Structures are given as structure tokens and as C-alpha cells.
Design a protein with these regions (language model features):
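Hydrophobic face of amphipathic alpha-helices that form TPR/SEL1-like repeat modules
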Residues: 60-67, 81, 98-103, 111-112, ...
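Bacterial signal peptide processing site
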Residues: 21-23
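Short helix-capping/linker turns of helical repeat alpha-solenoids
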Residues: 51-54, 67-69, 88-92, 96, ...
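Short coil/turn and helix-start
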Residues: 51, 69-73, 116-117, 148-150, ...
Length: 277
């Protein structure tokens, strides 16, 4: 389970109250719309700051994803932003749990996934999770019974059901399944699909294209990889490892005349590639 949580790390919506009174709603709606636009604009500003390497912007975006503030609530996207913040500041990714109060479903999920085995204490936490986040508990229940690839294949149906019911952990389990099964076609389809909601999965998809380039040296795969990295970058999710990879592509293929070398962009990527260790 520790290995699974390591992979996972590498890796309430904004409620607007409106009155039933038509006249009050007419007065409040413009303010609500203005507030919504302001919040969305703030998120876009934070993303642009993150794309320039502003460390605090990563932390602020993590909170936005935690709270659903201007974006759809997502603990997976939250972890991506917090992980980058941690890499930039020398912090510990596991401190992300401190963003939640005791008893919060994410804390339960964290504690379950961080446990080396399913002992009685963990089973009790899983029962509590079933009450507060049943879709996540459903995914864990299926995963803990999948010891072989055949069992994992059966569990995939449950993972898809759990994902439809709102489980984000089920998304991770599906990505891991295709990786362990060495199913490159299934992996590409899976990553392409889930990257629409969780942009950082574009980084893994891009990495898979780089590996394909290594097998056949078809430059179109490098172009696909670059496209994927920039899709993640558009959300401020180009983490140091992949910023460094993209910088390397500009350097290597630029010298060969296969990519246009953009010095200003390379300098930006160098900033993003920096970490404290």
C-alpha cells in the first residue's frame, strides 16, 4: 500500500445561496455572477503565476482544488499542486493531510493508503470511510482483493463504477492496472480520458510517447509528448521533472533543427525545473 500511495502522490463546491423570492434573486444574481467571475479570474491569475514558477501560487491552487474555489473540487489535482509546492520548498508531501480537519474523508483515505497492511484499525477506518465517501471505500474494497492480474481485471469493472460514482482513487487504480498489465494501448486510452479532468495525467501520457520515440525514433511521438506537457502546463501542473524533460527536448532537438529554439521559453522551463533537492 505504501508503494501505491507513493505512485498516487507523484505524482465542497462553492455554495451560493439564493432566495426563493424572485425580487431578491434579481438583486443578488448580478453580485453572485460578479463574485463567480472574480473567483475564476483569481484562479487564472494563480495559474499564470504558477507557470512562471511562483511557489506560493502552487499552494494557493492546492487550496482552490481542496475547496472547489473557482475550480471543480479534486484531491488528486490538489495533491499535484501541493507536491510541486513541496518540491519547491523542501517540504514533505505527506503534510498535505494537514490541510484537512480530523475525521475528514481525505484524512481517512490517507491513513488507509499509508498503512502497510489491512489490520483491524485500518478496517475500522474503512468502515468509517464507507459512511462519508462510499465511492472511495468501494474502490479500496475492490483493490484489496485484487492480488493477481486476473483478479485485478475483474476489479476494473468495480473501479469504473466507483469512478462514475465520484471516486478519484478509482482513477489511480485504473492507471496502475494498465501500467502493471503492460497494456500500452489501454494505458494510452485511459490516460487520455482521465487527463481531461486531471490535467497532470498528461505528463504520464507524454512520458509514454517519449518512450515510444525511444523504440522507433519517430519524431511525431516527441511532438505528441510536447503537446501533452503543455496541456498540463496550461493548468500550472508542469512539475519540475517534466519541465526539465521539456527543457531537454528544446535543447537536444533544437540543436538538430527539429524544434524551434525559444530562449525565453527555455528560461521559463529552467525556473520550473528547479527544486530544493
Amino acid at each position: 500500500m505504501n508503494r501505491l500511495f507513493t505512485i498516487l502522490c507523484m505524482v465542497s463546491l462553492l455554495v451560493l445561496h439564493t432566495s426563493c423570492n424572485d425580487s431578491v434573486m434579481d438583486l443578488e444574481s448580478p453580485n453572485v455572477e460578479m463574485k463567480t467571475r472574480a473567483v475564476e479570474q483569481r484562479v487564472q491569475n494563480l495559474i499564470q503565476q504558477a507557470r512562471q514558477g511562483d511557489v506560493e501560487a502552487y499552494y494557493s491552487l492546492a487550496l482552490c482544488y481542496r475547496d472547489g474555489d473557482g475550480v471543480e473540487k479534486s484531491w488528486l489535482n490538489m495533491i499535484c499542486m501541493y507536491a510541486t509546492y513541496s518540491q519547491k520548498t523542501g517540504g514533505d508531501i505527506e503534510d498535505v493531510v494537514e490541510l484537512f480537519d480530523e475525521g475528514h474523508p481525505f484524512r481517512l483515505l490517507f491513513e488507509i493508503m499509508d498503512s502497510p497492511s489491512f489490520n483491524e484499525e485500518v478496517e475500522a477506518k474503512l468502515e468509517r470511510l464507507k459512511q462519508s465517501a462510499p465511492a472511495e471505500a468501494k474502490a479500496i474494497d475492490a483493490a484489496k482483493r485484487a492480488f493477481t492480474m486476473d483478479e485485478a481485471t475483474v476489479a476494473m469493472n468495480i473501479f469504473r463504477e466507483a469512478e462514475d460514482e465520484g471516486s478519484e482513487l478509482a482513477v489511480i487504480f485504473q492507471a496502475i492496472y494498465y501500467d502493471e498489465a503492460k497494456d500500452k494501448t489501454g494505458q494510452e486510452e485511459c490516460l487520455t480520458r482521465i487527463a481531461e479532468k486531471y490535467p497532470f495525467f498528461n505528463l504520464l501520457l507524454g512520458e509514454s510517447y517519449v518512450m515510444k520515440y525511444g523504440e522507433c525514433e519517430d519524431f511525431s511521438y516527441i511532438q505528441k509528448a510536447i503537446d501533452c506537457y503543455y496541456k498540463a502546463d496550461a493548468y500550472g501542473m508542469l512539475i519540475p521533472k517534466y519541465a526539465n524533460a521539456l527543457w531537454g527536448m528544446y535543447d537536444y532537438f533544437g540543436q538538430k533543427g527539429m524544434l524551434e529554439y525559444d530562449e525565453q521559453e527555455v528560461e521559463r522551463l529552467k525556473v520550473l525545473a528547479k527544486r530544493t533537492y
